């Protein structure tokens, strides 16, 4: 990272890759692969829950419940070790007074404990996710598991992102030069840009409301075999 390079009118780039792999060397870290596989099975879980909620076919729903159980087991076997390892590993602490980045034992666990409200959000997210999955598997007449599970996933992912960047933490550590790790402080935009983004963010509730309305309009009628057989199919 070289912030002075922003004065270069030809190439005002303040950061660059340290080698020609352009970040692909991250694949050599087995834990990144574990996380990627966990996300893969999580996507399959949510997709299965969506099918159960939106396809009016009991045979397909029964098969989907079995697939949900298998994918949930695979997800937990991958995600739980990753989460435990992340909370117990050394983290990248940032000193706001000096700008120095250093290693700190169990930094992410301490972030979770220091910001107790994130712990509450994490707990709520986990409970919602488990509720959506368990009730869908155990109750044949329950089809709305996508809603609590989906909300739970959003909350858990949000907490993981925040403990990786808040509380003076480098969210994108450098494997080559520790002091070149990216933090919120050294990678944020100018005050003008941040002010503009803050104003634009006021419209987010309206965007979310539109998304909710559109999804409701699309999903209020369940998909049936007759619908698939007749008319245009997309």
Question: What residues fall within each predicted segment?
Answer:
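Alpha-helical transmembrane segments of multi-pass membrane proteins
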Residues: 39-42, 156-163, 203, 207, ...
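Short, membrane-exposed interhelical loops at transmembrane-helix boundaries
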Residues: 100-106, 172-194
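Membrane-interface transmembrane-helix boundary segments in multi-pass integral membrane proteins
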Residues: 106-120, 186-202
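Central hydrophobic cores of alpha-helical transmembrane segments
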Residues: 146-155
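Membrane-helix cytosolic exit motif
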Residues: 207-223
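Short, highly charged, low-complexity non-transmembrane loops/tails of multi-pass membrane proteins
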Residues: 220-234
């Amino acid at each position: 990272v070289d912030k002075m390079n922003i004065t270069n009118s030809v190439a005002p780039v303040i950061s660059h890759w340290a080698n020609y792999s352009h970040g692909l060397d991250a694949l050599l870290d087995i834990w990144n692969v574990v996380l990627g596989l966990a996300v893969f099975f999580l996507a399959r879980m949510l997709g299965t829950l969506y099918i159960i909620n939106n396809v009016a076919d009991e045979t397909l729903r029964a098969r989907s419940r079995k697939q949900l159980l298998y994918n949930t087991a695979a997800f937990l076997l991958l995600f739980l070790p990753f989460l435990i390892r992340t909370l117990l590993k050394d983290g990248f602490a940032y000193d706001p007074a000096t700008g120095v980045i250093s290693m700190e034992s169990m930094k992410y666990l301490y972030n979770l404990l220091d910001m107790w409200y994130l712990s509450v959000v994490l707990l709520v997210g986990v409970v919602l996710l488990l509720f959506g999955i368990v009730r869908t598997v155990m109750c044949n007449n329950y089809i709305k598991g996508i809603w609590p599970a989906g909300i739970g996933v959003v909350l858990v992912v949000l907490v993981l992102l925040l403990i990786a960047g808040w509380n003076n933490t480098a969210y994108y550590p450098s494997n080559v030069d520790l002091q070149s790790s990216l933090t919120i402080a050294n990678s944020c935009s100018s005050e003008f840009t941040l002010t503009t983004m803050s104003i634009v963010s006021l419209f987010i509730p309206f965007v979310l409301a539109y998304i909710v309305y559109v999804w409701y309009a699309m999903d209020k009628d369940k998909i049936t075999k007759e619908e698939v057989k007749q008319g245009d199919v997309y």
